[in-house]
A protein has these predicted regions:
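Ubiquitin-like/PB1-type beta-grasp interaction modules and other compact soluble beta-rich domains
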Residues: 1-93
């Protein structure tokens, strides 16, 4: 697929993952953990994760439009315009 056009997707980072947003983007966040970004057509979930330098050890659960994307499938899951990508770190407690 050509990467000559851009589409808008929403990225939601939960818990400490929000700390990985670049300082210049913090002002663009909505509702504290949500950021709308323009990405080239054909962008995969993994490319979005990589763009924000999210450490792989902290990327535990990824959903696109509420559907779980297994970690091994993030590189092959191509996003569409207006998709919502939600990322959670591992949950601890007891």
């Amino acid at each position: 697929m050509s990467k000559n056009f851009f589409m808008r997707v929403t990225l939601k980072l939960f818990a400490m993952l929000g700390d990985h947003l670049p300082a210049e983007m913090v002002g663009q966040r909505r509702a504290g953990n949500e950021l709308t970004v323009d990405v080239p057509d054909g962008t995969s979930v993994q490319e979005v994760i990589d763009r924000f330098r999210l450490p792989s050890r902290l990327v535990h659960l990824v959903l696109v439009n509420g559907v779980t994307i297994p970690p091994h499938a993030c590189g092959g899951h191509v996003l569409s315009a207006d998709d919502e990508v939600a990322v959670w770190p591992p949950i601890g407690g007891g």
